[in-house]
Amino acid sequence: MIDLRLEEDILTATLPEFLTTRPKYRYAYTNTKQQDLRLLGPMRHVRLTHLYKHTKLWNLQYIERELTNIEIDDALDEFMQTFSLPYTIEQGTYKYNMLLGMHAHNIGYQDDVSELIANNPQLLNYLNDNPLASIFELIDIDLQIYQYGQNIFNNEVEHMILFLKDNTYHGVIQALQKHPFSATHVTWHLHKHIFVFHSREKLLNKLLATGLEDSQLYQRQKTYSTKRGDRPTERMITYIEDDHIRRIQAVLPLLLDNIFDVKLHRDSSMTWLKSYADTIYDSAKNSDSTVTPEIRKLYLRMYNQYMRVFLPIEQYMLYDTTCWPFSEKITLKINVRLISSRENQPVSWKTPIDTENLISIVQPDNPINKLNFTAVPSTMIRLNDNIMMYRSVKDMFAAIEYIPDSDENIPTIEMKEQALSRYISPDSEAQNFFNNQPPYLNSIINVNKQVFEAVRRGNIQVSTGSAEHLCLCMYVKSGLIVGRTVLIDDKVILRRNFNASTAKMITCYVKAVTQLYGEGSLIYPGLRIVFFGVETEPAMDVLKLFYGDKALYIQGFGDRGIGRDRFRTKIEDALTLRIGCDILISDIDQADYQDPSEEKFDDITEFVCYLTELVISNATIGLVKISMPTYYLLNKISQNINNKFSKVNINIVKLSTQKPYTYEAYLLLSHGSTLTTKGYAKNPVCDVYLEQISLQPQEIKIISTISNEINYDKPTLYRLVVDKNDITDVSIAMHILSIHCSTIITRSVMVKNDNTGAFVTMSGMKDMKRVAIMNRMTDGTNENAYMYEDNGKLYLQKVPYLEDLVNAFPNGFGSTHQNDYDSSTSVINVNALVRQVVYRVISKSIPVALLESLSRIRIVGGRDLGEMNAVYKLYKTPVEVYDTVGITREYPHVQISYRAQRYQFTESIPNHTLLLANYVIMNDIDRAPISSAEQINTIKKIISKIGVGSIAYVQVYTDVVARHINVMTKNDSFLISANADKTVFKVQVSGYKAVEMCNYEQLLQLVSDNTGVHIIKLTYQDVLESCVLSSGILGDTGSWLLDLVLASTYIIEIRG
């Protein structure tokens, strides 16, 4: 499909001519005597603002008769003489981003992005097919574009298009979940985006309108007259859990033939659709004869799976991998009959943080714990922890490889004592808990499934020997038709015995063949591969299917187990056959934690040294699992191998298909080393393992009664049930939840047939940032009248009164449904998690002695107030935020002032000030990267300017680990690169411009030269604590990038 919106964008060289040419238009004089003038092409985005009230075009809307073509043409000609857009002409094929240019014009250059454009119109010029790339290099937020009515005389905002900074499917899903009245198409012009509406009604009307548009598109598709740029379907996806919207979304695919034939006005068609959705829902629920059993079953599935798009064959055949990833073909349709309409309106509330006009004097005057609340069980609402985790094919076989970092490979006594102490200590239960969460394995299976479905539909062609081909073989047991491309036979049989270990083994294979032969096909006829520690590993069947009729020698030896004695015989027996191979992969576990002792430890160490020697003796390249990656073990292996062989590479590898919190690593063994370094002294994989952690997982705490205690120490779901008819109890419960939760979901619960049995369930997950902000509330006297402390614990003294929540009560509370649930967990990417860790470490590092003496908090670059997580204990201390994005304003009720200006590090830091400068000193305000030397100089300025009793925390990225990376897969999360002589290292984080990492030795020198300056390193303990408290599960990048990101992120503490 071709992007029609891109085709509307014109060459910058032709923009002057465009701005003097009268636009095409459509005109009508409506039955209500209103002028309706709609400009076509790029000019349809123009908003006729009050700046043009003196033009003829403005005054046309007030004429109470039908206009002539001459009047309209004359008015448009005059308008084009006054209309302008910011631009810079560039010759060649540079195009002009018309949508963004029009947006800046329409709002009078009043937002931050429009100001950037006004100052530098060249940002609107682009090559290729990504017109937003330049803008997203300068901003780290989603891009908001307002859309107005098609009639140029309608200046009201209809909705907002939100172009997403996270330009992935996962980013779209997160945005839909964040914005309650939002939807997205199944394909995206320009860049992935969603549509955000101001109300449920506007969202519903949009979904109905696109349903009607889809019926017309469907008629064209049936006659094979689809136009360039047509989507497979015009219907949209929404994540709002609204009963009536789900009814409508579920019935639309079944009515595409019928809706087109209903010759009604659009409003009448929408009313009819709303009514008919109720009819089908009742029929399906009650199993009456209105619909067949097959349609009933399909309808209920579509109702419950509202995030999936269901397509008739004509639309399904146009679907490809660039579309919304969750789709299904249907073959059924239903006939139509009409009944009366009714609607149900569930409510999802976003509680306000902008408190300027929303908080009034506290009510009631009594402490919360003296109020009486009615509580009833709400067992209808289950707690769901099996959330979706997403990954792509390109990330499926990612890996990072570290080289030795020390000239010496001597396993010292200190190293042994450290390793033995760690061996005797049990693993963290919290780590084991997170590793065994179902989303991890499901995400791997889902990638394979998506490739399978795309091939079966004919939407993609998969080349033989490609990564996609390998994904198919992990999903299919038999039934692939392999030629130049791979097809799927009708009698295909799916694989049932796929597990997490299989995915690791396949990723080991990919790493090994890429190391041997470079990038390209993953099939090499005649390859010889051996697995140790397995005899019937499914990975062997996967590779046999992958190779098909091409020659492959593959064999496995040994059952899975622990220790030397169980394996030595089987492996030695195998080697008596003189098996020489290209690749040898060992998946033998070595950690025996039953009755650990020094004797067992020595036995394991000896066995692993023996095993690695066997591998490199019999293979060109080997990968050996290391269950306990300690400096002692790695140097012992290095010493043993280097004493017996010459020029052997012994590198540490982490794989993307390992469990996200795993300790284990793989040793990559190969011949031909040119390194002078042989040992390990500071590797992040070893550092993480050697931490001794005894952290227990915490089950989510469900609070179902009113409590005034503020709890920071447990993941908490608040679920309150109150009498729906008692407005006082309802109001107070809602306000209590608004202190703890950024989102509240309400549901009506009827336990009797009369109003005496009407209750409302209110639920929401604790949001730490929300709590930290709302705890700061005052009543306007600069005294925190809401909080009090007792024995080190915080309690709410009174309830804040949030006006907007009470005003929304008439909209209804919604109701429960069959698959209703509260989600207890969320997926978090590695950078977002480490940012949480930074805040947590800072909060623990602030000296207790300073908590009472600090008079202000300064946050640099804190537009999203994330740093509030770091200062939640300082809820009485005023906050000053400095960020160039946004507008200057005061939030007096929460003691926060926002200053839209650049913070000058040359300014003196007042006495008794806490300064937070996280994720800012490596970029200028225009997002231009700053060198390591300049970053060090900024820290020196802070040191020289810090006042008495003040303290500063500055986050930096250091190159201490980057210099020891041999190879890492390109990725969108944390990508490190180096200059030619590997003296300067850069990191690209989450798609931003690559920035220089601070030189490690210069940081050490900085600490040495200045008293009161310390380096704080992040620990794995901090990671697990953050995950436990937030109920966040690390995404697929965790397994191979977490160690690296942790070791590369330092906090510099500066005390005055």
Swiss-Prot record:
Assigned keywords, A-Z: ATP-binding, Capsid protein, GTP-binding, Methyltransferase, mRNA capping, mRNA processing, Multifunctional enzyme, Nucleotide-binding, Nucleotidyltransferase, Outer capsid protein, S-adenosyl-L-methionine, Transferase, Virion
A cellular component annotation (GO) from this entry: viral outer capsid
Catalytic reactions of this protein: a 5'-end diphospho-ribonucleoside in mRNA + GTP + H(+) = a 5'-end (5'-triphosphoguanosine)-ribonucleoside in mRNA + diphosphate; a 5'-end (5'-triphosphoguanosine)-ribonucleoside in mRNA + S-adenosyl-L-methionine = a 5'-end (N(7)-methyl 5'-triphosphoguanosine)-ribonucleoside in mRNA + S-adenosyl-L-homocysteine
Main location: virion
Keyword Nucleus: no
Pfam families recorded: Reov_VP3_GTase (PF20790), Reov_VP3_MTase1 (PF20831), Reov_VP3_MTase2 (PF20832), Reovirus_bridge (PF20830)
GO molecular function, one term: mRNA 5'-cap (guanine-N7-)-methyltransferase activity
InterPro entries assigned to the protein according to its UniProt record, in alphabetical order: Reov_VP3_bridge, Reov_VP3_GTase, Reov_VP3_MTase1, Reov_VP3_MTase2
Cellular compartments annotated: Virion
Highest taxon of source: Viruses
This enzyme's EC code(s): 2.7.7.50, 2.1.1.56
Function: Outer capsid protein involved in mRNA capping. Catalyzes the last 3 enzymatic activities for formation of the 5' cap structure on the viral plus-strand transcripts, namely the RNA guanylyltransferase, RNA-7N- and RNA-2'O-methyltransferase activities.
Protein family: Belongs to the orthoreovirus lambda-2 protein family.
Protein name: Outer capsid protein VP5
Organism phylogeny: Viruses, Riboviria, Orthornavirae, Duplornaviricota, Resentoviricetes
This protein's encoding gene: S5
